Every structure is written in C-alpha cells, then in structure tokens.
Amino acid sequence: MNMSSAFLPCLRLSALFALLFGLSVAVAAPVVPPPINALWDRDTVLAEATFADQPEPNTLRFVDVRVVHGGDARSEVTVRADDDALRMAKPGTRYVLAWQETQASPATKKRRVMRPDGPQLLMSPGVSPALLEARPDTRELLLQAPSAERLDGQAHLRRSLAGLRSDDPQMQSLFAAELFARSSLRQQLGWTERRRLRAFVLRRDRAVAARSLVLEAALIFPTQFGDDWSPVAARLLAREPVSSAPAQANEGLLWTAFGILQRDGTRVPIKHLTRWIACGNGALSELALHAIRRQAPERELPLIEQALAAPTLATGTREFLLEHRRRLLRMRERRD
C-alpha cells in the first residue's frame, strides 16, 4: 500500500484509539518537514539522473547522475526502493530523486551510520517515494535550495493550490504535503482557499494520498483550515467506495473523516455508517459501529446481526464482527 507519509500510521492510530474509547480527538501536530525541505535535509542526497535498469530485486540503477546536494559526484547510483518506485521507473527517463546513505545508529539515535543494504530512496510526506520526472517546472521547484523568500509567500501558496489540479498524482501529493507541513502557507489560508481544499478532498479523480493529507491537516489544524469540515467528512462516508479487502486505498481518508465527525460531535444518517460495517477493514468497521453506538445504541447489535447474515461477508470481517458482538453482549450483561 502506498502510504502518504511515514508518520501517518502513528497519527491515525492515536486518533483511532481516541475514537474507539470515546475520547475527544485532539491530535498533536506532528513534526514533519515540508517535502521540498526534506529533499534538502542534511542526511539526504538530492540529484538528477536517468533511470537505467533494475540490477536486483527492489533496486533501481541510475546513470548520468548530477548530484545537486548532500553527496559526492558520481556517474551512477543504485538505490533500494519500494514497490511503488519500481512500478513508476521508466528506462531512459530523467528523474529528480533523493536518497539516504546513512541511518540512525541502533546503539544511539544521535549517531548516523552507513546503511548496510546501501542507499535507500527517500520516503517522506509528499515525496513517497522521492522519484519525480525531471520536467522543467519540477526541476525549477525542487533543485533550488529552500528559502523563505521563495516558499513562504503568496506565490508559493498559489503554486501549491494550483498543484492540486495537476494530472500527476505525485505532484498533487507533494503540494498537499506543502500545505500540511509548511506553517507559513497554513497561516495564509482564507475562505476561498479553504473552499477549494474542501472541494479537492471530495474529488475521487484526485490522488487519495493527497486528499488524505489535506483532510488530516483539517483535523489537526482547525484554526488554519477552518472548523467546517464535518459536511465533507459526512459526504465521504456516504460516497467513498467500500471494499471487502483488508487494506483499502482510501482507509486513511476514512479514518480521518470519522475523526472529524467525532471531534465536532456531528450526527450523520445511520445508513451512511452502516455501509462500513461489512467492509474488509476491521478498524473502519469498528469506527462505524462506535459511531452508531453514539447516535443510536439500540441499533448496533441488530446491524451486526444483519451483516453476519450476508453469505458474501469476508472471512476476516466475519471473525471481527463475531468477536465484537461477543464483547458487546458481555458489556451489556455487566450493565444489567
């Protein structure tokens, strides 16, 4: 699964536990760099190069390398990469890429040591993986060192909002992460920009990773993104496709939608929650059941029974619902 960032699983889990145990959702802002800054981190090598081939499984070899930042000049480099990067790389294509040759020492996190498996393609919010086609606008944006003059003003805000309309899913995610992580951009958001962001999250023809980042920003930064996202969250639960697979591409988007509704105390039609009970993702199913319990506790058990009666119910979902029903009945016995 293509995660939009390395911090998102921890962020979602913290919000998830708050939701499941009926706590108010107040998620601390994660400390993550804007993607352009991440490319220029002191432990990152930034370069432009041409993809050649895959010499070994999960590796990419680049030639005609031009190192821009962080490393010594070289003619070629081989980096370890995830499945997404392996699918994306096209022989003969010129790329902007970033990798890390060191990692935190197992003995002490304050020291850096060489990676035993060799250079690793960077994975960071908005550049996950850090492998983008070297088009003129991409080179101009990424191969210049970050500066407040270039990236903190209205021009970069306009560029980021326009980038969400790109046909390239990677650029959508990069600019969504810029809006998420660059505080100077968040502070400039007005009514018009917020309206455009709400519309973007609802567009199913946009990259789900980018939509998830914007919605999570709305959950974490309500002062800058506004407190009127509940209608967006409710529409997502009503319209997003339901899958019987355990891993759903839109699961992060939906977790955050549940988080916003819980934060704002918003009630939604039960039928919009019911459609998630029988999905293949246990966390989403449980979030839906807890939302139903908050609104109409008397309907939770009948809806579980209804889902269990479906012959097409996925095995994993059936096991989860049986266990959830057992816990629910035990909880009711204790109350009685």
Task: Report the location of each language-model feature.
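Bacterial N-terminal signal peptides
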Residues: 12-24
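Short boundary/loop segments of OB/S1/cold-shock single-stranded nucleic-acid-binding domains
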Residues: 29-43
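Extracellular C-terminal loop/segment signatures of secreted glycoproteins
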Residues: 80-166, 170-171
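Short coil turns that connect the paired helices of HEAT/ARM alpha-solenoid repeats
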Residues: 164-170, 202-209, 239-252, 278-283, ...
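Structural detector for short beta-strands of small beta-barrel domains
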Residues: 42-65
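Bacterial N-terminal signal peptides that target proteins for export
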Residues: 2-15
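Amphipathic alpha-helical scaffolding segments comprising HEAT/armadillo-like alpha-solenoid repeats
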Residues: 152-162, 186-201, 224-243, 266-277, ...
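Structural detector for internal amphipathic alpha-helices that build alpha-solenoid repeat scaffolds
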Residues: 140-150, 173-187, 209-224, 248-266, ...
